[in-house]
């Protein structure tokens, strides 16, 4: 039924495999045959990972096997208490705000997880929907309910093949547990696709993936045309996004289908010199969800993401845009930001609900049909991870738990701030008006090579770099230097070799307060010189 998986397994079982492929498959089979599954499961439950071993096996495996991909794609399983809280909140709000008596179980509800992983969010939504149905109507008609609602109206997208395959297996298990066995011509609508790419894939020649273009076509139709009422999930966190294309650029920067872009504020350009954090993947997924709901005219978004957008000035256009689309926004800041060394208000330890350093927040956003205006509500949740899990596991969404914020131009903060004197504050000159020539700091993009505590050490490195008898692989191995989109190592070495003034680029650098080092300040090495400002610091100056 699932074209891609059918193609892959058919190819492995009956296809003409190369000798290398046969060895790989045989090795995998031997490892699986030798695995003590009961012991693994006992260890899993002993460590308190939750109810769903499929999810954790995948994330743990990827962390060991390919940590770069895990980091690049932002693969972090969502703790089940978080998932349960969000799905319960959506179910409750469908009933109370949209007067849909059966909540997620209603036939008029369409649901999408655009970054599905192993289907943790859709799985929980299905459990809630089936429970609602059984409580109201009993077991009679349950099979028909699953066929005509769950398999018809629930969608999910996933980019990576492994979680895609696991997700389909998991869904088959779940539905069987709920008393429904899928027929040969049925499938759950999880599609292998990049949510942030609107182009249909062309027919591929890769063995075992002949159905990829068909899968892409189905997904594209949902992205572009299918009205979605509920969008949930845990989008990837990746500051250096791999998702850069013309469509995402338009989605973020321009007004699309009436939804204000994130690069404007109060009708004016943001004028941010460094707006790279608006390119983070989680921002793009939130924007995609906002666009789908805005286009549909009503709906709910329930997601857990990086919490930086709540108060970072760069995101003020994003905050205003969300307020222009949604009528009610509920934000639970789960904190846990070790990068900021966050602590609980009483000075006790504050932990993240994920195994990451970046703090996170749950957002539940509601758009009602033909409604105007927006109210933003906020709640803090500090403390130990287990206490946060306990709260999210047991507590239901209650509006009075959240505090109404006074969100004002030009910042539109999504956290509690005293804004009583904001107009007085805004009447003062901005610092960039006082200092018209300004920038952020130098970016070498290769500090370990371009900066040193001792000038002689740095001179040795540059001497090696200019010596064309050394291979570029040497610098990759010893200094982690390699070409990037903005810098070519071969070109830089060649140009520096020809530069007769190469010995004139050593300067003292205040790397951090009271931390003086030496930098090789040349565009052949330093990626962003910030020369308009730094040229004033190169010689004697009050600065």
Task: Name each model feature, range by range.
Residues 17-20, 33-44, 65, 69-70, ...:
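Residue-level signal for secondary-structure boundary elements
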Residues 1-66:
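Long recognition/docking surfaces used for binding and targeting
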Residues 1-29, 76, 499, 504-509, ...:
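Nucleic-acid modification enzymes, centered on SAM-dependent nucleic-acid methyltransferases
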Residues 4-11, 83-85, 114, 388-391:
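Eukaryote-specific, cytoplasm-facing alpha-helical/coiled-coil scaffolding segments in long proteins
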Residues 1, 70, 95-99, 371-376:
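Short, solvent-exposed secondary-structure capping/transition elements
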Residues 2, 21, 25, 50-55, ...:
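Alpha-helix initiation and N-capping motif
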Residues 243-245, 272-273, 291-543:
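Sequence-level detector for compositionally biased, low-complexity segments
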Residues 49, 61-332, 341:
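SAM-dependent methyltransferase catalytic region
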